[in-house]
């Protein structure tokens, strides 16, 4: 049994299934997806089992939109003896290469959350047993595969592994963030998560630094502006609504009452453009391309709201449209997109120009 296990947002299993089916077939890897609505995961069964490992290594995880985590499943163990779950796990995985990390996980559903406490408690004895059997390094080792135990019930587990160079670094594929007490809205967490997912941590001091100028379109009440302000940026917040007074009191925010689709900066000194406006994805996509065409920003983070039907097709279509529009400007643009944990019926898209980022690096 060598299949792919893919974590996703509950309710988006069909989108994850469509995505893995298309991306795998593009690599001449064929199979079918087993989908259970609202389960928070998809199993992709390959006709050639050896191709599961190939996809786990070669299909770029960062390019996947609706998939939070990707791993190879090698064994499914059911009806485990509750007094000794560890022995059958060790027996099943004797052929594994030594792994550098262990993740005992479950699905991101209300039902599965009841297993979360068990998973935490079970991690310690399982880690000790794996190390004792030379299946896990004595210390966490970033460049080794990750050992996954994905529990569907306390006596039912899927065992597998992912590659640390091509997976999500986060437990269950979810960054653990807390909404700051002084943030104007919980939407603030969307942008914070986007920074964690899209911008390498070692580049934060260069690309998310104090003194940068940023624009937040559709800013009110200021959830996204808050994330920029806390990093020391000077922010122009564009919205006809009211901004949180706590943000205005920082002296870092200039509030312009205008339509975010219409307003443009008078100077070409904006680095970040962020946007969480509710509108048709096509309109937002073309607006973002226009900002780059006019050199009104150098890096952007924005959300695309998805329709109720054909969500995967709509997401892919708009990203392809954006890619073609940006190619007319420069071939150095990079587009990343993900349905983040804090996103709902939407995806977050990140755009930057490799050449412009390299110039920032040169200044360092």
From Swiss-Prot:
Example of a GO cellular component annotation carried by this entry: cytoplasm
EC number(s) recorded for this UniProt protein: 2.1.1.186
Function, in words: Catalyzes the 2'-O-methylation at nucleotide C2498 in 23S rRNA.
Main localisation: cytoplasm
Subcellular location: Cytoplasm
GO molecular function: S-adenosylmethionine-dependent methyltransferase activity
Binding site for S-adenosyl-L-methionine: 187, 220-223, 239, 259, 276
Keywords from the named record: Cytoplasm, Methyltransferase, rRNA processing, S-adenosyl-L-methionine, Transferase
Pfam families hit by this protein: FtsJ, RlmM_FDX, RLMM_N
Protein name: Ribosomal RNA large subunit methyltransferase M
One of the GO biological process terms: methylation
Catalysed reaction equations from the record: cytidine(2498) in 23S rRNA + S-adenosyl-L-methionine = 2'-O-methylcytidine(2498) in 23S rRNA + S-adenosyl-L-homocysteine + H(+)
Keyword Transferase applies: yes
Domain of life: Bacteria
Protein family according to the UniProt entry: Belongs to the class I-like SAM-binding methyltransferase superfamily. RNA methyltransferase RlmE family. RlmM subfamily.
Keyword presence, Cell cycle: no
Quaternary structure note: Monomer.
PANTHER family reported for this sequence: RIBOSOMAL RNA LARGE SUBUNIT METHYLTRANSFERASE M (PTHR37524), RIBOSOMAL RNA METHYLTRANSFERASE FTSJ DOMAIN-CONTAINING PROTEIN (PTHR37524:SF2)
Active-site feature positions: 305
Annotated gene: rlmM
Class of enzymatic activity (EC top level): transferase
Leader peptide range in chain numbering: none
